[in-house]
C-alpha cells in the first residue's frame, strides 16, 4: 500500500513538473516585469478621435499576463508606425473607458483595434494576427494601403 502511494505521488509530481516546464519554455507563464500601464505609449483616446490618422487602440488590464507579454510588441509597432498611426492604450477596467469598452464589445484581453475616425471605420485585429509580429505588420500595411485607395477615391470624387 505504501509503495502504491509513493509511486502515485511521484508520477503526479513528475507530471506537474513537466507541465510547468513546458509552459515556461513556451512562454505561457512568463511575463515581463513591467505592467502595461507603465509603458505610457501613445496619446489619449479623445485626441486620436480628432485626428485624421487611424489609431491602433489597445485594450488591456495590468493583471492580464497576455497583455504583459504583448507590450514589447506594442512598443515595437509604435516605433515602426508612429508616422502612420496614432497609438492609444485603454485600461479595460477604468470607469472612464467603460463606454468605448462596451461599444467595442471587449470580451478578452488584450484586444487590438484599428479605429479610423476619418472613415468612421473600426477593424478588430484577432490574437492570431497581433501575437505574431510579422502577421501584424502585414495587416497594418494592408490597412494603410486600403486607406490610401480611399483617400484617392475621395479626392477624385471631390473634383
Per-range role (PLM):
Residues 102-106:
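A short glycine-leucine-enriched loop at secondary-structure breakpoints
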Residues 35-53:
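A short beta-strand-turn-helix
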Residues 1-36, 156-159:
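N-terminal targeting signals for export/organelle localization
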Residues 108, 113-159:
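Non-catalytic, surface beta->alpha helical segment in thiol-disulfide oxidoreductase systems
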Amino acid at each position: 500500500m505504501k509503495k502504491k502511494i509513493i509511486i502515485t505521488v511521484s508520477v503526479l509530481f513528475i507530471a506537474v513538473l513537466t507541465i510547468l516546464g513546458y509552459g515556461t519554455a513556451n512562454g505561457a507563464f512568463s511575463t515581463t516585469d513591467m505592467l502595461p500601464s507603465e509603458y505610457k505609449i501613445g496619446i489619449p483616446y479623445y485626441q486620436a478621435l480628432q485626428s485624421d490618422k487611424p489609431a491602433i487602440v489597445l485594450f488591456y488590464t495590468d493583471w492580464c499576463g497576455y497583455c504583459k507579454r504583448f507590450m514589447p510588441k506594442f512598443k515595437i509597432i509604435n516605433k515602426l508606425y508612429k508616422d502612420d498611426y496614432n497609438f492609444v492604450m485603454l485600461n479595460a477596467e477604468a470607469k472612464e473607458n467603460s463606454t468605448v469598452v462596451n461599444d467595442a464589445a471587449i470580451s478578452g484581453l488584450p484586444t487590438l483595434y484599428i479605429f479610423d475616425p476619418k472613415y468612421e471605420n473600426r477593424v478588430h485585429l484577432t490574437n492570431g494576427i497581433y501575437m505574431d509580429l510579422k502577421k501584424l505588420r502585414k495587416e497594418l500595411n494592408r490597412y494603410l494601403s486600403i486607406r490610401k485607395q480611399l483617400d484617392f477615391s475621395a479626392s477624385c470624387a471631390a473634383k
